[in-house]
């Protein structure tokens, strides 16, 4: 409840700020299937171009509290880390073998919540072409909890005067439609991970075409 109330406070007070910083224009792969209104449990996946991808996602889906997995790099910062925890950020230490955050995600989903994940796991470095290879955590979580996946792609066009950020929301991926009973759990996780990455790549191309059209 606290995270929800704090989210609403930040969204209401921060709306004018995000408008000038991002001024996000939102497109849809198919609005009749997936809009900005998320009902029930879901896993939101996004490409990862900037630390500002999270607030863009937060304001893209304003009616829900997005519980994003966040790395130790930001969560260990004294002020920022506390602020992100208050918003509902889920601490993920990529340098350890502590997977307790997955149990926390499962609990949130069991209560109808929304988990946010950037499956690339980190920002691309100079010379790397995004999207990077996907980690398998999002696929594992979706399959074990039978949770629909909502894909989202952003162009990372933030803080640019007289330019807008652009986001496209894709149609949901139902993990049960992807899973093959003839495959092992590991193979199904790898298969769903490939499907998710292919979807993000496809949405990225679609977003590029839509922005050119205006």
Regions found by a protein language model. Name each.
Residues 1-43, 52-56, 86-89, 167, ...:
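Membrane-anchoring hydrophobic helices of lipid-metabolizing enzymes
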Residues 2-5, 102-214:
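Non-catalytic C-terminal accessory region of glycerolipid acyltransferases
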Residues 26-29, 77, 99-102:
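Structural motif corresponding to alpha-helix initiation and N-cap regions
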Residues 30, 48-49, 63, 72, ...:
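Short, flexible active-site-adjacent loop segments at beta-strand->alpha-helix junctions, enriched
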Residues 30, 97, 155:
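Residue-level "edge-of-site" marker
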Residues 36-96:
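Catalytic core of membrane glycerolipid acyltransferases/transacylases, capturing the structured
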Residues 95-98, 131:
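A conditional alpha-helix N-cap/helix-loop micro-motif detector
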